């Protein structure tokens, strides 16, 4: 029934450019907030107000204040998967796709990345000239993805490439053939000559992958990587 399917930033941009004045955003709270920030004159409706992303709340005003007091030359970099309140307290907002580029361009030596520590560690590896201060937030799906199950999936599907989201811990990312945002994973699968992929991210992406790449096979870990707290209903993924 959706007119558009995609990640939060893509859909927020679609909402901003759409001629319609009312947007129905089927997603979690921070997604609707992001759409409203980019489209302040439009009405944004959320069908499930209790659908929420726990990670979006895993930073505090007090924590940000303490870091600003301790470091003079610090930029608070906020992941888009955060509440509007946290975005307001930050210096810049990034996506997983553009975070490395933006952090590299910042004049600040010290970077306080909120709320996700795994994405922060991934960015820090790409930008070694910066000093990162880590927040202890995490995605409840990616954080608990079992690296042993990823290994088992690779053994079960030896021809498959592993595509992982940078919100995954290092134990998973080290096994990946390619690391990217949700949109990056989809594009890689579309462009690749490979026919099989193990997907290390929330399995809601399966629909988009299978509809855009009907001739390819996608596998997930034995423990289904689904965000139950988001209340988004999906079908059982292929293992």
Set out the residue ranges of the language-model regions.
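General beta-strand structural signal in soluble alpha/beta enzymes
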Residues: 1-7, 24-27, 45-48, 76-80, ...
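Glycine-rich, Lys/Arg-enriched anion-binding loops that position phosphate/diphosphate groups
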Residues: 115-182, 189-190, 201
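A C-terminal functional module that forms or caps the active site or interfaces directly
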Residues: 6, 177-231
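Active-site cofactor/substrate anionic-group-binding motifs, chiefly glycine-
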Residues: 4-54
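Residue-level detector of conserved catalytic or cofactor/ligand-binding positions
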Residues: 232-238
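A generic, well-ordered mixed alpha/beta core segment in the N-terminal half of proteins
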Residues: 37-79
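Active-site glycine-rich loop that binds ribose-phosphate moieties when present
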Residues: 57-66, 85, 91-106, 113-119, ...
């Amino acid at each position: 029934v959706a007119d558009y399917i995609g990640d939060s930033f893509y859909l927020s941009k679609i909402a901003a450019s759409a001629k319609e004045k009312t947007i129905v955003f089927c997603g979690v709270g921070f997604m609707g907030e992001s759409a409203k920030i980019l489209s302040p004159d439009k009405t944004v409706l959320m069908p499930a107000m209790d659908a929420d992303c726990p990670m979006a709340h895993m930073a505090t005003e007090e924590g940000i204040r303490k870091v600003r007091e301790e470091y003079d030359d610090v930029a608070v970099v906020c992941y888009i998967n955060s509440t509007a309140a946290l975005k307001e307290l930050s210096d810049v907002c990034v996506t997983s796709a553009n975070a490395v580029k933006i952090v590299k361009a910042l004049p600040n030596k010290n970077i306080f990345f909120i709320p996700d520590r795994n994405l922060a560690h991934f960015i820090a590896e790409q930008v070694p000239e910066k000093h990162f201060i880590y927040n202890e937030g995490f995605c409840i799906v990616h954080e608990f993805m079992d690296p042993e199950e990823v290994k088992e999936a690779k053994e079960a599907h030896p021809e498959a490439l592993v595509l992982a989201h940078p919100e995954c811990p290092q134990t998973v990312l080290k096994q990946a053939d390619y690391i990217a945002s949700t949109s990056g994973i989809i594009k890689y699968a579309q462009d690749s000559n490979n026919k099989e992929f193990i997907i290390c991210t929330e399995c809601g992406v399966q629909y988009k992958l299978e509809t855009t790449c009907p001739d390819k096979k996608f596998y997930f870990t034995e423990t289904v990587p689904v965000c139950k707290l988001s209340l988004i209903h999906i079908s059982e993924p292929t293992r």
